A protein has these predicted regions:
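Small-residue-rich transmembrane alpha-helical segments that form helix-helix packing/gating elements
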Residues: 1-34, 39-171
Length: 171
């Protein structure tokens, strides 16, 4: 092993360690706020990476259809909650269900950025709203459940997201 290979391995180790540290930090933050051990956290990273690859290949990331479907479902659930007389925070609901999906659609369909920073922004805007949307759709109705039950639901969500990833991105 020469110095160049050692430096490349060291750089790879630092980058991999940073990714693991960020994932661990995200897991702790999500658990401390929501009591959910979010097993499906890795799927968000995978969705972002595969969306970035699709954008760089000049294709429309198929994950935009999942984002639109989630946004529509959450909007319908919030309308149903309001019809039942439950309070609804329309500012955050419209942000996550209308504004950010519309921005993602504009970036993916209309702008199609050519530089890597714009492509990264597009991938992030495509994937980021899915976290709060899935929380509102899956975990908020179970807010008073035990941590064990939330873990079981999180594992189920993980498998659903793996299946959706295979459907939208292919094997």
């Amino acid at each position: 092993m020469n110095t160049q290979i050692a430096l490349m391995l060291a750089q790879d180790g630092v980058v991999t360690g940073a990714v693991y540290a960020l994932m661990a930090l995200a897991l702790v933050l999500v658990f401390s706020v929501t009591r959910v051990i979010l097993i499906a956290q890795g799927e968000f990273v995978t969705y972002a990476a595969l969306s970035m690859a699709a954008i760089q290949a000049g294709a429309l990331p198929a994950i935009i259809w999942l984002l639109m479907a989630l946004a529509l479902l959450v909007l319908l659930v919030e309308l149903w909650r309001q019809a039942r007389g439950l309070p609804v925070d329309w500012r955050s609901t419209l942000l996550w269900t209308v504004l950010l999906p519309a921005l993602a659609a504009l970036l993916a369909w209309g702008v199609k950025p050519q530089n890597v920073w714009g492509q990264m922004l597009t991938a992030i805007v495509l994937v980021t709203p899915m976290g709060p949307l899935l929380y509102r759709l899956v975990f908020r109705p179970l807010a008073h459940a035990s941590v064990l039950f939330l873990l079981i639901v999180s594992v189920a969500l993980h498998w659903v997201m793996v299946g959706l990833g295979l459907y939208f991105f292919g094997a």
